[in-house]
Amino acid sequence: TFSNTLQCHNVAGNWNFAIELLAEHAGPRVVGLIGAVRAPEIGYMFNASYWGHGYATEALRGFMPLFFGHYSGRDIADYAGRDCKEERNGVRVNGSTAKAPLAPRYDYAEAHTDTELVPSQNVLTKVGFKFHEKREKDFENPVLGLRDTLIFRMYRPAGEGWP
């Protein structure tokens, strides 16, 4: 499954994963990253060689239930990589009975994209994100200067299977 292809990476409150392309004839290959960069803001990036193959859509579809599960107000150990062997916020998460701190609850996820990154906007809308707002000249790109940003949001779905 998709969640089995993710490798846990948790630094200073971020919740990020490597995306691996698994091939029968070769070992895993990291092709991108996905995660909560500043929750509730999510983000993803891929090696340009893998653009246009549906990997971003597949990864985001797999990640969003994990995002809402992790940021549900429940114990972090319930969702934060039970198989990872490191400690997070001083709490061991590999089966320890120590009480983990609560993850904050977010009822939406937000993605920021440049107005010209139409393929990324298409990925977001395919997965269920909706346009929320346009922010003018709010991001400074070192090469392109001040840029406008489009904000897309996905709200926590109600119903079974969603924490």
PLM regions and their residue ranges:
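A short helix-loop-beta-strand connector motif used in the catalytic cores of GNAT acetyltransferases and
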Residues: 2-18, 32
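Acyl-donor (CoA/ACP) binding surface of acyl/acetyltransferases
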Residues: 16-163
